[in-house]
A protein has these predicted regions:
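N-terminal beta-propeller domains
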Residues: 1-57, 135, 170-172, 186-258
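Short glycine-/Asp-/Thr-/Trp-enriched loop segments that recur within the blades
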Residues: 28-30, 144-145, 231-235, 275-281
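Inter-blade boundary loops/turns of WD-repeat beta-propellers
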Residues: 54-57, 101-103, 166, 175, ...
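Short coil turn/linker residues within repeat-based beta-strand modules
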Residues: 58, 177, 219, 263-264
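Small/polar beta-strand repeat architecture
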Residues: 58-70, 78-147
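Short coil/turn segments at the loop-to-beta-strand junctions that recur within blades
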Residues: 141-147, 185-190, 273-279
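Hydrophobic or amphipathic alpha-helical targeting/insertion segments
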Residues: 149-185
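Blade-edge beta-strand/turn elements of extracellular beta-propeller
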Residues: 182, 259-275
Length: 281
């Protein structure tokens, strides 16, 4: 069920894949997808020891099973944003290659298309179905990663996505999907992350489960205490952090706190309850 615009709830009409390709695994097909996020024109997915990205759009003009595409075909879609200028596409179970994109045409087009590649069979495709790219590896070596959590932020005019997995160094992606690790020892292994008052807050490290670390203003990777970074300790194991209005709420196993203020000089912890907690934030 989903919320109804007229009030209450309504039954969902169904669902379909947003990306047709299966997320690759690292070493075992039993590995679960442990994180998914939408960032810019891409979809981010985390599985095994790696993080991947892919692009998705919808078909604007139907394709018949008999349409000939042998290097000069076109596929008309809502948008080519996020797709490479040449590459591979998948519609349902059929795969295509293309050699160009036309973002000036309305709707957009993939050009130089060849269909039924990689031993797939030409089939009819109706409008509004998913057109997607293969998954591209954007980060590796994330050994024993658990559930991913994400934070989108913009401190310097550039949109970024920060990912934590509870084990490895947090990783930051810009819109070009270039990865930068946050390697400060106290931050590596953080399970929770939130941007609050232009500081990046990290928590959930297994060796310091009661500790909240925060960066200097407008820099998610600088923890110099003299420049506005610091730590805050609560008297319980942190299970989640979340910004709501002008406060950062800190959920613990048996307690809930909120952080107010705007900088290291006036940050203050206020208890909300000491009798109700949150086992898994």
């Amino acid at each position: 069920f989903e919320p109804d615009v007229e009030g209450g709830y309504r039954r969902m009409n169904g669902y379909r894949r947003f990306i047709n390709h299966i997320v690759p695994h690292t070493s075992s097909i039993n590995e679960k997808v442990i994180g998914v996020a939408k960032f810019g024109d891409k979809v981010i997915a985390c599985r095994g020891e790696k993080i991947f990205s892919a692009a998705s759009t919808e078909l604007s003009t139907s394709i018949t099973a008999t349409s000939t595409m042998s290097g000069s075909g076109t596929i008309v879609v809502d948008s080519v944003a996020g797709f490479a200028t040449s590459g591979t596409l998948q519609l349902d179970s059929e795969k295509f290659t293309y050699t160009g994109v036309d973002s000036a045409s309305k709707p957009n087009e993939f050009t130089g298309v060849t269909r039924a590649t990689e031993s797939t069979t030409a089939a009819a495709h109706v409008t509004r179905i998913t057109v997607s790219s293969p998954w591209t590896e954007i980060d590796t070596g994330r050994t024993n990663a658990s559930k991913y959590r994400f934070e989108r932020f913009n401190y310097d005019g550039n949109e970024k996505l920060l990912c934590v997995d509870g084990v490895n160094a947090p990783v930051v992606f810009n819109l070009a999907l270039s990865a930068t690790d946050v390697t400060t020892t106290a931050i590596v292994g953080s399970k929770f992350v939130a941007s609050f008052k232009s500081h990046m807050f990290y928590a959930g490290k297994s060796t310091t489960p009661e500790l909240l670390n925060f960066s200097i203003p407008s820099n998610e990777d600088d923890f110099t205490s003299g420049n506005g970074a610091g730590t805050i300790r609560v008297d319980d194991t942190i299970t989640g952090i979340k910004v709501f209005r002008d406060s950062l709420f800190i959920f613990c196993e048996n307690r809930i706190f909120k952080l107010t203020g705007s900088s290291s000089s006036d940050f203050a912890i206020i208890p909300i309850t000491r009798n109700i907690g949150c086992i898994n934030g």
